[in-house]
């Protein structure tokens, strides 16, 4: 399988990945930065969306996997099924925001995002449920941070 050498796994810190990704996008302007958030994490730190949109990094894609639950911490429901994250992203000032609910549209949006020269928000509606063999990180948070920082330099 694919390793996580280039990933910064923010396990246990729901909502901070978009802020971290913004900082990286601002310092690595020649690299495409992909931030994958969950709906629960996005909702926990929704103010980050306003900050992201105000900075408009043209090399960043913000993807929110919306299964309407805090799945990794027990599956408690979120309110993401009752609100419109795309409208919120647009209201915050994202230049492009879209919601997809099938693989064909997701593939199309990811290909377009790869080539785009502007901040993009992609909400992916998905079902609740994760792989039975989905593991946890095998490194400590400190090791993960250090490896990621080495990769950035």
What are these regions (language model features)?
Residues 39, 60-63, 71, 81-88, ...:
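Structured catalytic cores of enzymes that bind and process phosphorylated ligands/cofactors
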Residues 15-17, 103-108, 128-130:
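A short acidic, often aromatic-flanked loop/helix-cap motif at beta-alpha or helix-coil junctions
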Residues 74-77, 135:
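Short, solvent-exposed loop/turn segments at secondary-structure boundaries
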Residues 67-75:
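Long, charge-dense
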Residues 1-67:
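Thiamine diphosphate
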Residues 9-10, 35, 98-101, 124:
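General beta-strand structural signal in soluble alpha/beta enzymes
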């Amino acid at each position: 399988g694919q390793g996580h050498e280039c990933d910064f796994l923010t396990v246990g810190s729901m909502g901070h990945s978009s802020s971290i990704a913004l900082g990286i996008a601002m310092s690595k302007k020649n690299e495409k930065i992909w931030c994958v958030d969950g709906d629960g994490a996005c909702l926990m730190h929704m103010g980050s969306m306003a900050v992201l949109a105000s900075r408009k990094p043209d090399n960043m894609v913000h993807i929110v996997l919306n299964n309407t639950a805090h799945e990794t911490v027990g599956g408690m429901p979120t309110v993401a099924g009752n609100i419109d994250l795309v409208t919120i992203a647009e209201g915050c000032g994202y230049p492009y925001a879209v919601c997809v609910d099938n693989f064909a549209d997701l593939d199309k949006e990811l290909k377009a995002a790869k080539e785009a020269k502007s901040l993009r928000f992609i909400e992916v509606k998905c079902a609740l449920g994760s792989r039975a063999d989905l593991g946890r990180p095998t490194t400590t948070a400190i090791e993960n941070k250090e490896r990621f920082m080495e990769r950035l330099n």
